[in-house]
């Protein structure tokens, strides 16, 4: 065959073109493409096929013709956006990127292998810049918060509704008002108070009804209300901007009372206990017989001084050799009263007043106009007239124009002389003579 014939030349050109059109398939026996003999069998170095030069057909495959793309374009992209998700994934440990194909999540990118040079070629970190708002205005990283003015509102809850500051009464019949008070009671600041820093003071007066004369009395007064008139319950609610949560806790009412007691000095109360042979008396209280188990327990409990809740000073006067029917003066030696000294007198004759021991009896203490104290026994069927006769007998020279009052606040006069002690309810009571 003639090698210079046109058929031979055309055939040779077709073979060369076919070989040139074949893809550049790497040689599996090449040292550069052998599996990485590391301790990680599932990891291998990925070299894209686009990194190889095109086969020119002049000779067999030569590894020396392997060319790598320069890494500068990718480095430029990394420098432009080092915090992108792609760059974060590509920056692995070591100087080459290693993809794990065991999970089937390998990348199909045809980018060339990037060679990182440690500290020198590490992705460039952008300097921290001031953040920008949506209007392209520079915003400082440290915002200077302007001081907000604190608005204080006083919410007073009544049995028939509630008031805010000096506003009119808002009844609970209105669902909106009931919801407002429910939010306040749950220690949250309602939206109606505005997007500002708010302090709410809650005062509970649920035992009394709201009247127009009481409007504004709590908001302007700083004195706490009496304990017997209402339950003192105050809560501080601090509400910041765009927040309806409570930032400051509620102060317990018990803790508030303990704090007030610590701030105030203790008051020393003095009691005078007179012990008789058949019972005892405490100050000006009625006679207490030892036949009652509760009264006997009082004498055993008294020295502990735990009954009254405050530091006490108890002065005991022993009169065990006398009965309680005898007249005694209980003026204390430490008293600085300007009243005239009390005198001890003998009890009048009981011939005009007969006491039946078998009938129900009671002890009544009489405080006469001259400050003399007389304690005697009566039957419960005796009348007020009998008590007056007893006083008249003890003071034969005294005036009969006087009133008998039941000691109390205020004193109650006994105007019905024919009323019995039982019906008047003055058993074991203290009666005062007043002209």
From Swiss-Prot:
The keyword GTP-binding does not apply. Residues 1-150, 208-265, 311-352 are annotated as: Disordered. Residues 252-265 have a biased composition (Acidic residues). Transmembrane segments: none annotated. Residues 112-129, 231-242 have a biased composition (Basic and acidic residues). Residues 211-222 have a biased composition (Polar residues). Residues 357-434 form the UBX domain. SUPFAM superfamilies: NSFL1 (p97 ATPase) cofactor p47, SEP domain, Ubiquitin-like. Residues 49-62, 130-141, 312-323, 333-349 have a biased composition (Low complexity). Keywords: Repeat, Ubl conjugation pathway. Coiled coil: none annotated. The keyword Chloroplast does not apply. Residues 150-211, 268-343 form the SEP domain. InterPro entries: NSFL1C_SEP_dom_sf, SEP_domain, Ubiquitin-like_domsf, UBX_dom. This is Plant UBX domain-containing protein 6. It comes from Arabidopsis thaliana (Mouse-ear cress).
């Amino acid at each position: 065959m003639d090698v210079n014939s046109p058929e031979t030349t055309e055939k040779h050109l077709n073979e060369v073109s076919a070989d040139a059109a074949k893809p550049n398939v790497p040689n599996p026996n090449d040292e550069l493409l052998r599996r990485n003999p590391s301790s990680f069998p599932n990891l291998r170095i990925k070299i894209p096929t686009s990194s190889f030069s095109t086969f020119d057909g002049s000779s067999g495959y030569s590894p020396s013709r392997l060319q790598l793309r320069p890494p500068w374009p990718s480095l430029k992209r990394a420098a432009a956006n080092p915090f992108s998700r792609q760059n974060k994934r590509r920056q692995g440990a070591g100087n080459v990127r290693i993809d794990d194909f065991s999970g089937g999540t390998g990348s199909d990118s045809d980018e060339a292998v990037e060679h990182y040079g440690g500290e020198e070629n590490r992705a460039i970190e952008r300097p921290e810049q001031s953040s920008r708002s949506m209007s392209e205005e520079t915003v400082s990283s440290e915002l200077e918060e302007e001081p907000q003015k604190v608005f204080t509102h006083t919410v007073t809850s009544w049995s028939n509704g509630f008031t805010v500051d000096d506003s009119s009464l808002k009844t609970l019949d209105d669902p909106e008002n009931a919801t407002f008070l429910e939010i306040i009671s749950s220690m949250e600041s309602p939206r109606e108070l505005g997007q500002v820093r708010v302090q709410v003071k809650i005062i509970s007066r649920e035992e009394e009804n709201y009247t127009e004369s009481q409007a504004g009395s709590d908001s302007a007064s700083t004195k706490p209300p009496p304990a017997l008139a209402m339950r003192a319950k105050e809560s501080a609610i601090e509400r910041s901007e765009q927040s309806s949560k409570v930032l400051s806790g509620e102060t317990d009412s018990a803790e508030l009372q303990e704090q007030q007691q610590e701030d105030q000095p203790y008051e020393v109360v003095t009691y005078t206990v007179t012990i008789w042979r058949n019972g005892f008396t405490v100050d000006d209280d009625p006679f207490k017989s030892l036949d009652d188990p509760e009264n006997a327990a009082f004498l055993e409990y008294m020295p502990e001084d735990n009954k009254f809740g405050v530091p006490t000073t108890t002065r005991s006067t022993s009169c065990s050799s006398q009965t309680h029917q005898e007249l005694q003066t209980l003026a204390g030696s430490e008293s600085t009263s300007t009243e005239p000294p009390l005198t001890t007198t003998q009890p009048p004759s009981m011939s005009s007043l007969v006491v039946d021991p078998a009938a129900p009896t009671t002890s009544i203490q009489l405080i006469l106009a001259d400050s003399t104290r007389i304690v005697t026994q009566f039957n419960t069927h005796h009348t007020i007239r009998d008590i007056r006769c007893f006083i008249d007998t003890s003071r034969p020279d005294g005036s009969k124009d006087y009133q008998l009052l039941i000691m109390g606040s205020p004193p109650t006069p006994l105007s019905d002389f024919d009323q019995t002690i039982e019906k008047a309810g003055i058993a074991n009571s203290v009666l005062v003579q007043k002209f």
